[in-house]
Amino acid sequence: MAEVESFSLDHTKVKAPYVRLAGRKALAGGVVEKYDLRLAQPNREALPTGALHTLEHLLAGYLRDHLPGVIDLSPMGCRTGFYLVVEGPVGEEKVLEAFAQALKDVLAHEGEVPGASFRECGNYRDHDLPGAKAWAEKVLKAGLRVQATVPLEAR
């Protein structure tokens, strides 16, 4: 099986919430960067699916408002955060600032969750705006920071 970057991260030595550069790839005419936007401490807590799903919908738009070149935002299967893919180079500090602002936008969001209707969403019943706001508030209160990659030690 091919190597997967996140499987070589020592999840016991990182401290959420954080922003971490998880990968950078040069392509013809540019660079693509992947960022680990971690909200919950690995193996200690996880976001409920409704809150995670709603954060995905809201952050997909709000991050684009604050950070040019966003390609994709995807939730992690472990439900502790998101992967953000951007045209780079951007840098962790810029991503951190945009992420913090987008979380503030989530807190201020009123009304319907964008893209959450039967026709727009593959699981439209699984949304939780109050839960999404609670996680945004928790992360902002804890304070985001840049996290260095901590590789697993040789076994």
From Swiss-Prot:
Keyword 4Fe-4S: no
InterPro entries (UniProt xref): LuxS_sf, Metalloenz_LuxS/M16, S-ribosylhomocysteinase
Keywords: Autoinducer synthesis, Iron, Lyase, Metal-binding, Quorum sensing
Cofactor: binding details: Binds 1 Fe cation per subunit.
Residues reported in the UniProt entry to bind Fe cation: H53, H57, C121
Known EC number: 4.4.1.21
Metal-binding recorded as keyword: yes
Pfam family, one: LuxS
GO biological process: quorum sensing
Reaction(s) the record says it catalyses: S-(5-deoxy-D-ribos-5-yl)-L-homocysteine = (S)-4,5-dihydroxypentane-2,3-dione + L-homocysteine
Function description: Involved in the synthesis of autoinducer 2 (AI-2) which is secreted by bacteria and is used to communicate both the cell density and the metabolic potential of the environment. The regulation of gene expression in response to changes in cell density is called quorum sensing. Catalyzes the transformation of S-ribosylhomocysteine (RHC) to homocysteine (HC) and 4,5-dihydroxy-2,3-pentadione (DPD).
Family, similarity comment: Belongs to the LuxS family.
UniProt-recorded name of the protein: S-ribosylhomocysteine lyase
Source species: Thermus thermophilus (strain ATCC 27634 / DSM 579 / HB8)
Lineage, opening ranks: Bacteria, Thermotogati, Deinococcota, Deinococci, Thermales
